[in-house]
């Protein structure tokens, strides 16, 4: 239950592993559908969770472990009721990759890359993605956004102004 909530949150929000691990019980506001993140440089941001399945996974975890997580103060805890570590999150990702038969080496940070890239490919403004990821500089965000060659071609065919000019 916890593992699914961790994986769902990583992919749905693009949070850094360190941000997920330091997420406090009071930082998760499921009724409002948002989490408060303390990013690099002690920057605070709010990230919305719009997907009902993600909210459901977080709610199930929160209800099942309410006593433990309220007592510890951390939202995601290990079996010793301590906050999850970065290594624990890597182990969770590896475990579910093995179970799914994924042979490629997948890291938790790849969820962040995928989050940014998929939003960009769906036409989301890079400045909005920058805010979601908590980047100070747009240059940092551009590193995360790998647009596939075919997608670039489709965008150019569909959006480039030259395609709307027809000579007789």
PLM feature spans:
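Conserved catalytic core of the tyrosine transesterase superfamily
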Residues: 1-168
């Amino acid at each position: 239950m916890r593992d699914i909530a961790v994986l769902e949150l990583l992919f749905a929000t693009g949070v850094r592993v360190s941000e997920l691990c330091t997420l406090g019980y009071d930082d998760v506001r499921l009724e409002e559908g948002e989490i408060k993140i303390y990013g690099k440089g002690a920057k605070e941001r709010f990230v919305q969770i719009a997907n009902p399945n993600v909210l459901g996974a977080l709610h199930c975890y929160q209800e099942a472990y309410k006593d433990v997580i309220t007592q510890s103060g951390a939202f995601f805890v290990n079996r010793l009721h301590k906050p999850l570590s970065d290594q624990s999150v890597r182990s969770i990702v590896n475990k579910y990759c093995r179970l799914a038969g994924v042979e490629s080496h997948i890291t938790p940070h790849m969820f962040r890359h995928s989050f940014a890239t998929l939003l960009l490919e769906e036409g989301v403004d890079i400045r909005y993605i920058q805010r979601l990821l908590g980047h100070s500089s747009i240059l940092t965000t551009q590193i995360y956004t790998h647009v596939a060659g075919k997608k670039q071609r489709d965008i150019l065919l569909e959006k480039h102004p030259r395609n709307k000019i027809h000579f007789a």
